[in-house]
Structure formats: structure tokens, C-alpha cells
């Protein structure tokens, strides 16, 4: 399934870095740091990185999810400060990425470096019906760890 997403280039330097799928099977689109100069994240530090881009999904049946790049997280401890970013369909502002250095070494974020992935996902908006009791299920109220040993 393909949808068309409106995008604004807020910083002309990003015109050469429009998000694109790397392969036919790619789910995520890389987002890049729109920085004038390198920013060094010390261990434990967070920094809100601009991307120089804005999107408008318009259709409430979709949202965008911002996720960490696996290599940055595994090799350098760089993840998203909010763990997952959610871009609602009606948001039209600049995409920004909260980076968090959970590693033990300083990490330099360079201008135009790939810093996160964006995945467009379907959304179901639920309506809630208040009830006094649920119809029974095999799980019942079993929570954390109730279905296995780990």
C-alpha cells in the first residue's frame, strides 16, 4: 500500500536529503540531522536535533513513528530520548529527533548524519464502551510474566 505524504523542506540544505526507502523491502525512511556544526553528546545527555523537514499526513488513518537506527543504538548507545516519537496526522511542524546518549563515551552528531528512522503506520481510533464486568477469557487478569517463565 502506498500513500502520498506532503512534505516541506524547511532548510534548503536538506533538499538533497529527502527521505527515501533504501530498498523495496525497507519499512523505514532515514531522517538526517540538519545542523550547522557537529554537536557532541556527552554520556547521559539529550539533544533535540532538527531535521529541516516537515510532513503532513492529513489522513487520521495514518501516523508516523520515529525510531532509533539500530547501528547507532547498538554500537554507540545513541537512542531516542523519548524512546519512540509519534507524529500525529494533523501535525505540520518540523520533525525533530530527541537523541539520548545512554552510552559511556561522548558521541559526535555530524551535520546531515542519519539519526533516526521514520515509519508510516496505520492507526485505528478506538471508541470506548464502559462496562461493569468483562466477558471471561483464558488469561483473565494475568499480567507481567503470566504467560511464560521469562
Swiss-Prot record:
Keywords: Hydrolase, Magnesium, Metal-binding, Nucleotide metabolism. Pfam families: dUTPase. The lineage of its organism: Bacteria, Pseudomonadati, Pseudomonadota, Betaproteobacteria, Neisseriales. It is an enzyme of class 3 (hydrolase). Pathway: Pyrimidine metabolism; dUMP biosynthesis; dUMP from dCTP (dUTP route): step 2/2. This is Deoxyuridine 5'-triphosphate nucleotidohydrolase. Belongs to the dUTPase family. The keyword DNA-binding does not apply. Its EC number is 3.6.1.23. InterPro entries: dUTPase, dUTPase-like, dUTPase-like_sf, dUTPase_trimeric. PANTHER family: DEOXYURIDINE 5'-TRIPHOSPHATE NUCLEOTIDOHYDROLASE. It comes from the Bacteria. It comes from Neisseria gonorrhoeae (strain ATCC 700825 / FA 1090). Its cofactor is Mg(2+). Gene3D superfamilies: 2.70.40.10. GO terms for molecular function: dUTP diphosphatase activity; magnesium ion binding. The keyword DNA damage does not apply. GO terms for biological process: dUMP biosynthetic process; dUTP catabolic process. Substrate binds at residues 69-71, 82, 86-88, 96. CDD domains: trimeric_dUTPase. It catalyses: dUTP + H2O = dUMP + diphosphate + H(+).
Amino acid at each position: 500500500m502506498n500513500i502520498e505524504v506532503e512534505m516541506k523542506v524547511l532548510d534548503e540544505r536538506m533538499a538533497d536529503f529527502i527521505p527515501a526507502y533504501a530498498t523495496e523491502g525497507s519499512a523505514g525512511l532515514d531522517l538526517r540531522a540538519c545542523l550547522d556544526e557537529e554537536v557532541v553528546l556527552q554520556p547521559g545527555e539529550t539533544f533535540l536535533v532538527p531535521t529541516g523537514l516537515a510532513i503532513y499526513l492529513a489522513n487520521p488513518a495514518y501516523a508516523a513513528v520515529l525510531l532509533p537506527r539500530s547501528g547507532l543504538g547498538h554500537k554507540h548507545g545513541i537512542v531516542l530520548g523519548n524512546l519512540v516519537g509519534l507524529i500525529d496526522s494533523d501535525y505540520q511542524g518540523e520533525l525533530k529527533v530527541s537523541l539520548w546518549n545512554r552510552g559511556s563515551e561522548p558521541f559526535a552528531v555530524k551535520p546531515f548524519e542519519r539519526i533516526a528512522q521514520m515509519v508510516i503506520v496505520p492507526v485505528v481510533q478506538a471508541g470506548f464502551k464502559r462496562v461493569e464486568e468483562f466477558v471471561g477469557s483464558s488469561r483473565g487478569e494475568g499480567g507481567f510474566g503470566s504467560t511464560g517463565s521469562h
